[in-house]
C-alpha cells in the first residue's frame, strides 16, 4: 500500500515489455519477486558466459553436440530429429519451415504484431555507482524509473511507438556480487531500456541521464561503454 511497494511491483511488471495495465503483468511481477525474496536474483561467477559453458558441458555429458556457424535456412538443413526448438522470431521460423507449417499457423505468424525491443549499454566504471539510496549501492539489480506512475507511463510510450524522455531502465551491478567482474576499486555495470519496434534512436544519453538522476556523479565515473541497439542484440 506504500509508494515504494507500488514502484517495486511496477518495476518487476515492466519486465513483460507490455503496458502495465495489460492482464498478467502483475503475475509476472510476482513470479520474479518470489524467488528474489527467497534467494535473490543470481549473478554468474566469472561472467555470464559461464552459464553457457555449463549448459554446453551438460549437453555433451548427455551425448549432445553443439554446431556453430551452421546456418539453417530450410528444415532440410537440420540433422535427423524428433523435435526441433527454434530460438527465432515467428517470421524466421515461417521462412525456414515454409509449407511444412499448417496454414492457420502461417496466418497467425503473418498477423503477429511485434513488440518493443531493448537498447542496452555496458559500462566500465572508475568506482561503484554513487546511488543516493544506500540500498541500491548494495544491490545487484536496480530498477531506475521513479514511482509506479513514471514506470507505467514510460512503458506505455514504448508500446505506442515513442521513446520517453525518461525511460524505465533496468540496471545490473554484477561486480557487486562477483568481484571477478572488475579490478579492485572499479565496477562494471549494464542497463537497458525498452524502445519501440524498429527504433534506431540512440538512447545512451537518456539511459545515462536517468541513472545520473538517482546517482549524481555517475557520468564522471565512466571509463568506457559498449552500446547495443535492438538490431545489434538481434544479431548477437
PLM feature segments, named:
Residues 1-23:
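Rossmann-like flavin
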Residues 8, 12, 54, 58-62, ...:
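Generic, well-ordered alpha-helical scaffold segments in large soluble proteins
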Residues 29-73:
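Helical element adjacent to the flavin cofactor pocket in flavoenzyme catalytic cores
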Residues 16-46, 182-185, 191:
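Redox-cofactor-proximal catalytic regions of oxidoreductases
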Residues 6-12, 68-72, 221-228:
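Beta-strand segments within the central parallel beta-sheet cores of soluble alpha/beta enzyme folds
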Residues 134-236:
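Conserved flavin/dinucleotide-binding core of flavoenzymes
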Residues 2-5, 44-48, 52, 65, ...:
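Generic structural signal for well-ordered, non-membrane alpha-helical segments
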Residues 64, 68-182:
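Mid-domain catalytic core of redox enzymes
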Amino acid at each position: 500500500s506504500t509508494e515504494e511497494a507500488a514502484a517495486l511491483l511496477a518495476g518487476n511488471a515492466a519486465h513483460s515489455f507490455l503496458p502495465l495495465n495489460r492482464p498478467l503483468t502483475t503475475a509476472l511481477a510476482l513470479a520474479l519477486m518470489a524467488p528474489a525474496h527467497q534467494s535473490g536474483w543470481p549473478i554468474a561467477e566469472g561472467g555470464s558466459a559461464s552459464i553457457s559453458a555449463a549448459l554446453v558441458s551438460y549437453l555433451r555429458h548427455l551425448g549432445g553436440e553443439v554446431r556453430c556457424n551452421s546456418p539453417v535456412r530450410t528444415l532440410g538443413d537440420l540433422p535427423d530429429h524428433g523435435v526441433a526448438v527454434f530460438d527465432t522470431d515467428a517470421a524466421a521460423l515461417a521462412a525456414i519451415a515454409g509449407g511444412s507449417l499448417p496454414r492457420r499457423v502461417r496466418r497467425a505468424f503473418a498477423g503477429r504484431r511485434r513488440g518493443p525491443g531493448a537498447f542496452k549499454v555496458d559500462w566500465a566504471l572508475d568506482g561503484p555507482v554513487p546511488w543516493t539510496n544506500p540500498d541500491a549501492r548494495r544491490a545487484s539489480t536496480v530498477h531506475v524509473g521513479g514511482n509506479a506512475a513514471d514506470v507505467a507511463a514510460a512503458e506505455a510510450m514504448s508500446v505506442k511507438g515513442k521513446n520517453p524522455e525518461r525511460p524505465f531502465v533496468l540496471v545490473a551491478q554484477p561486480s557487486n556480487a562477483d568481484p571477478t567482474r572488475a579490478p579492485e576499486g572499479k565496477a562494471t555495470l549494464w542497463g537497458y531500456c525498452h524502445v519501440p519496434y524498429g527504433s534506431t534512436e540512440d538512447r545512451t544519453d537518456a539511459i545515462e541521464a536517468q541513472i545520473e538522476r538517482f546517482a549524481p556523479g555517475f557520468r564522471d565515473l565512466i571509463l568506457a561503454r559498449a552500446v547495443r541497439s535492438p538490431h545489434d542484440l538481434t544479431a548477437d
